Amino acid sequence: MDFDVVSRRLARLRALMQEKKTDAFVLLVLERLNSENCHYISGFRGSSAALIIDGEEARLITDGRYRTQAAKQSPFSLTVQADLPLPAYVAKAVTEKGWRTVAFEAEKVSHGLFEAVLRPAPTRWVDGSAFIPSLRRSKDDMEAGAIRAAAAIARKAYDLALERVKPGMTEVEFESLALSEIKRWGGEKG
């Protein structure tokens, strides 16, 4: 993803954080859960990460497997996780920075994780579950272009698959044809 796109999205997130009076925003990706929001705001596509964003810095924390990938995919400052689990890094950063109000995606964090790791940090945690989805509702130029390209691929794939439909063919067989054409013309499985 283009780093300029990430920078514009980050600026919009920071404006929202200021509007909601939060000092920082935390996003966790654990075993791929929430990876779509992480990719949207940082460009990073790994299965394990934490993002910590305040008014001056955007930090990506991930384990050593993703060091090279993270540096290529995201302009965020990189911390390689070594001696602590990701949520503990978040709690440590919040404590060190002294932020008073931190937004996090409560809908994506288990109650047990929150109680064990995040709550003890000396801050007021607020639900920021709607932050990224509210940004995603308004499409930027890159997203609009991707939607147009996907529609063109889907139309072409559908038309080509329709040409191969035969009496007695099952829906599963047609789906297989359509997906094959989508991949052939550059589409991805979503």
Label for each model-derived stretch:
Residues 4-10, 85-190:
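Flexible, acidic/His-enriched mid-domain "rim/lid" segments that flank
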Residues 1-95, 152:
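N-terminal accessory/capping or targeting/presequence segment of soluble
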